[in-house]
Amino acid sequence: MIGDITAASKIYIVCGYTDMRKSIDGLCAIIEDKFSMNPKASILYLFCGKRCDRIKALLWEGDGFVLLYKRMAVDGRFRWPRNKDEIKYITWQQFDWLITGLALEQPKAFKPASECGKLTTSA
């Protein structure tokens, strides 16, 4: 199905600035050449330009690429990490935060139970 991002096994964001004039082939070249990753993996790759008001998402669907584009409404900005030359894995929760304009790290958010440590019971 076109644009079903839930089919992605992982999400990676390309930190820093990306030239938003790039299309599928240019974004694939960044993934392959700069980060030595496979753009045809079941991974959602996210890119952001200097203005931080639009992002592109690239996903391989098995028979072709899907390129998604989101532009924030008036004065909206994405909180994008600017570490140059880095690609970063993010969770689906972080993706939700990012896509709505929040920062990737939300210190006051509840952590999933798997990150809180093991619970012990006493007999």
Question: What is each residue range found by the language model?
Answer:
Residues 1-123:
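Polybasic/polar functional segments that serve as interface/processing modules
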